[in-house]
Amino acid sequence: MTPPHILITGGAGAIGGQLVGQFRQHHPEARITLVDLNAEALALARDQHGAHAETCDLTDIDALPGWWQSLIDRRGPVDVLVNCAGIMDIISITGTGWERGKRLLDINFTAPMRLMELALPTMVEARNGCVINVASMAGRVPIRGCSYYGGAKAGIGLASEIARLDLKKQGVNVITVYPGPIHSGLESHARSQVKKGPVSRYIPTGKPEVLAERIYRTFRKGGARVIYPDIYALAKQVANLNLTNRAMDFFSPQPNQ
C-alpha cells in the first residue's frame, strides 16, 4: 500500500509545525510535504520531521496549477490537504489599502480555495481523502480592524462547511477549524497592531500543540470541525447577532491604525 501523501501549507508556522509533528507521530511512513514562503524556517521544519519542503508564494494564484502538477508528478497525488497558511493584520478598512488587503484575501481565502480545487479530483476519483481548512473565529464574529482578514476567514470557513456537504457521499472528509488567538508569530504580529489595554492583555489565547492534537483527533474520527480555545465555542452558540455585535464592539481591541 502506498504511504499517504500529506501536504501542509504554512508548515513552518506554529500551528503547521505542530500538525506536522502529529501526522509524523501517527503516520511515520507518510510522505509529508511542507509548503511555506519562509525558506529558513521551512528547512528547519523539514529536517526536524523528515519531510519534503516546497517554497511557494501562495499569492501567485495563477502559478498554483503549474506548481501543483509539478508536485504531484514528483511526489504523487495528495491524500490529505491541510490549508494552514495564513497572515493577519488588525487595521481599519480605510487604513489597510488595497495591496495589503488583496494579500490578506489571497493567502487566507483564494489560495486555499484554489488548492482544494486542484486536490479534490484525485480524492473524489479514489473515494478517499481529507481536506482540513484552518479558518478563524474572526470569521465568525465581527472584530474591529479585521474587515479583510475576517472576511477572508468567513469565506473559507463557509466554503469549507459547504464542501463537506458536497463531498460527504464521495468518500472525502472536509474539516473546518475555527481557532481563536493561538500563541504564534501571527498572533504576536496581530497583537502588536492594537492599542494596549485589558482586552488585548487578557484575551484567552490557546497553545498550538493543543490545537494540533485536537485537529488530528478530529481527522482520525472523521469529524467536521474544531473550535479552540474552548471559550470561543460560546460565540458559536450565541443566537442574537445584535448581542454578539454589541459584545464584540465592546471587547474588540482598538487598532493602532
Segments (PLM) and residue ranges:
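Active-site loop immediately N-terminal to the catalytic Tyr-X3-Lys motif
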Residues: 94, 143-147
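Substrate-binding pocket helix/loop in short-chain dehydrogenase/reductase
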Residues: 92-93, 100-105
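Residue(s) in the substrate-gating loop at a strand-loop-helix junction
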Residues: 136
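Conserved NAD(P)H cofactor-binding loop of Rossmann-fold oxidoreductase domains
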Residues: 84-89
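Conserved glycine-rich cofactor-binding loop
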Residues: 12-13
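SDR active-site lid
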Residues: 165, 169-230
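Active-site helix of classical SDR
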Residues: 116, 152
